[in-house]
Amino acid sequence: MSTSSVPSLTYFQGRGLGQFSRVLLSYLGIPYENITVTEISDALRATLPYGQLPIYRDGDFVLTQSSTIARYIAKKHNFMGKNLEEEFLVDQIVTAIHADIFPAFNNPVPEKLQKLYEKYFGSFEKKLQETGFLVGSSVTLADLYVYVGFDYIRFRGEAALSSELSDEKYPKIAELKKFFESNEGVAKYIKERPETKF
Amino acid sequence: MTKPQLSYFKVRALGQFPRVLLSYLSIDYDNNYIDKIDENIIDDLKYGQLPLYTDSNGFKLVQSMAISKYIASQHDFVGKTPEEKALVDETLAAVNIDVFTFIIRVFRGVEEKEKIQEIIIPRFFAKWNQILGEKKYLAGGNSYTLADLYVYVAYEYIGYVLPFAADLLYNGKFPHLDSLKEHFESNKGVAEYLKNRPITERKI
């Protein structure tokens, strides 16, 4: 277990559900300990509220569920929009990615997946074309989530029907990717992260 | 000012969380039952899905978990500190993304029903029962929050959709979850909602 004074994020070495918070922490320039495990040992499982990773430790405070971890960090750093309405429009997008998109490409049915991508990423692309941001008038966790989700599906390859998500089809989301990857913290994280299968 | 509106199909499923919440908080709202998504409503649906919540100020929101948190935030029902709020969020994500999705997959025959006993009950319901025994409230603190309501709805829902799960969960096996159910169902607004909710054609 970490004894560090900086927060720690524990997840498998793969990207998976750990990617959202890792990219977020890197983007916000928050020093953290990136702990990777190859499996959940019995000793580790005993410390996990639902026996699952990722887990985030901030001092004595322990949190699981990747979307919860990301929202907690984002809220602390004013990255959830400017008012209550914006906060929940961000939440709406974060939930859509976690509850609808991620489960679908883990159990893919090609025709359904194609429609799903068009529905969600089409909606995100349209919003970015109209206003430049997914919520409000500045970058929020919603933009970061769409970038990470989009990028991750492409990383997973054809098993996740990645060819559906081309730069040509979604130019504004491709710009979002460029924006985040030009951030110093994110660029450093990407350069140093290991090659993994998932 | 108009009343808030919640639009969803004439089934429990994802609409149940905000419906029970609105009833528990005694918020006067229009409970719109939708037969099918048609051109009258499709433009309001960000991802072509229900439920849809329209607040009294005209603000529209989809995704049942986002809707519930938005309503609860307006009524001081999401915990008092950033940590409590995060623990509420953690519970909601577990209910919505892990438990609810799994229940539906078992209901549709995509997932083996044995996994309810092997994974869902020990990892989630037993854990919640334990937390309630230790702390009285799921997010700690000193009052009920949306986390408690979400777990109650999931606890009631699983036995309704998967009758075999009722035998594994109810009848005193998880006394603190039973007390939670009692708390919410003795609330005047919730009791009235439960009494008046329609028997649905699809058991979902």
Curated annotation (Swiss-Prot), chain A:
Residues 5-81 form the GST N-terminal domain. It is an enzyme of class 2 (transferase). This is Putative glutathione S-transferase alpha-2. It comes from Dictyostelium discoideum. Residues 83-198 form the GST C-terminal domain. InterPro entries: Glutathione-S-Trfase_C-like (IPR010987), Glutathione-S-Trfase_C_sf (IPR036282), Glutathione_S-Trfase (IPR040079), Glutathione_S-Trfase_N (IPR004045), GST_C (IPR004046), GST_superfamily (IPR050213), Thioredoxin-like_sf (IPR036249). One of its GO terms (molecular function) is glutathione transferase activity. One of its GO terms (biological process) is glutathione metabolic process. Conjugation of reduced glutathione to a wide number of exogenous and endogenous hydrophobic electrophiles.
From Swiss-Prot, chain B:
Keywords: Acetylation, Transferase. Residues 2-79 form the GST N-terminal domain. It holds the Pfam family GST_N. SUPFAM superfamilies: GST C-terminal domain-like (SSF47616), Thioredoxin-like (SSF52833). The keyword Transferase applies. GO terms for molecular function: glutathione transferase activity. It catalyses: RX + glutathione = an S-substituted glutathione + a halide anion + H(+). Glutathione binds at residues 8, 49-50, 63-64. Coiled coil: none annotated. The modification N-acetylthreonine is found at residue 2. One of its GO terms (biological process) is response to curcumin. Belongs to the GST superfamily. Alpha family. Conjugation of reduced glutathione to a wide number of exogenous and endogenous hydrophobic electrophiles. This is Putative glutathione S-transferase alpha-3. It comes from Dictyostelium discoideum.
